[in-house]
Amino acid sequence: YRQSIVLKPDHAEAYFSLGNTLRELVREEEAETSYRQAIALKPDYTVAHNHLLSCLYLLDKRSPFFDQLDYLISKDEVNAVVGSLTWRSALKYGVEKPNLFCKEPLEYVSHIDLSSKYNFEEIFVESAKSILNDERVSNRQQSLLVNGYQTSGNLFSIENDFTEKIQKVIRSEIEKYRVNFKDSEEGLIKKWPTDYSLYGWLISMKSGGELYPHIHEQGWLSGTIYINVPPKPRSKADNGNLVVSLGHDHDATDTD
């Protein structure tokens, strides 16, 4: 990306991509600079504004963070990143701002037993095995994952019968979700995208595996399908369950 910037210094997308790479390397200060350069070249670069907001929060730059959050709220920016950080900053700093995405996100958590509605073994279990045996599928490094691995890229970009079966089920359940909440006044529902694409991957964890708290920054709606869960003793019935929350454990109120 740096070479691209040298060749074309007015390339906002190159600065944005560089910022993303720097964030993956936990070089947040440099990432902030790159995002600001991208925005300077392209002021309406929404995704860069969103990533800058995340970066400022991680850097604990309270005043610049709220300046950026206020800017996005004034622009009526409705997305999961802004919604999440509105909640997290309220927990951390005790400052409440209008949440244009979802004021009560935990009210919109849905749990579905897919095995009672579909041929789960064929659609998910067998498909997952076939996908993992596909030579086009590789694994990627995932810093949020302990004692496990994650496939790289978007599985749904691989066109075959297995991914198509899974997509059909997911799209059907997404539509049922939307219809279920169709009367909601939340931005999550009222601003529902007219078109969308699916982005998915497989995660495999061994005993003792763990996935740290995170948000899917590019997603409007996120979900997890548990395909193969080993039997659990009654004393550890909650082990491996998906946990949803309004923020991370470290989003405690800042008393300074």
What are the residue ranges of the model-derived segments?
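Residue-level recognition of tetratricopeptide repeat
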Residues: 11, 45, 77-80
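Conserved alpha-helical positions within TPR/SEL1-like repeat arrays
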Residues: 13-24, 47-54
